[in-house]
Amino acid sequence: MATPKQAAKKASKKRSGGRSAKAGLIFPVGRVGSLLRRGQYARRIGASGAVYMAAVLEYLTAELLELSVKAASQQAKKPKRLTPRTVTLAVRHDDDLGMLLKDVTLSRGGVMPSLNKALAKKHKSSKKARATPSA
């Protein structure tokens, strides 16, 4: 039997977890940090830089997925899957992501649907309005 002191000591020695868990993130902070160091974007990379970068990547990914799901649900009654087309439509319709990714070409995304005003069909006016009175 463990004494109460030993039990309290064991409970306080919980495993601390990784940096992602400490920061409350899903994206791997360690992997992002190693990729930052390997890419040689700067001579030195601080510990908080990897956490911040992972948080930004996680936020942008969540935002992109949320908008893509909305775009897919607007296209079909029951959205079954996200395609590059729905991601492209979501990015181009959102103001902030559109500005951020304005020079990015998404593979298999297609183009934004737009119709030139000159090519749009003109509605015919009613027959009564077109008829001229005979004199």
Swiss-Prot record:
Sorted keywords for this record are: Chromosome, DNA-binding, Nucleosome core, Nucleus
Can you say where in the cell this protein is located?
Answer: Nucleus; Chromosome
Coarse class of the primary localization is nucleus
Tell me the Gene3D superfamilies matching this sequence.
Histone, subunit A (1.10.20.10)
Cellular component, GO annotation: nucleosome; nucleus
PROSITE patterns for this protein: HISTONE_H2A
Q: Name one Pfam family in it.
A: Histone
Tell me which domain of life the UniProt entry assigns to the organism this sequence originates from.
Eukaryota
Keyword Nucleus set for record: yes
Return the protein name: Histone H2A
Q: Which organism is it from?
A: Trypanosoma cruzi
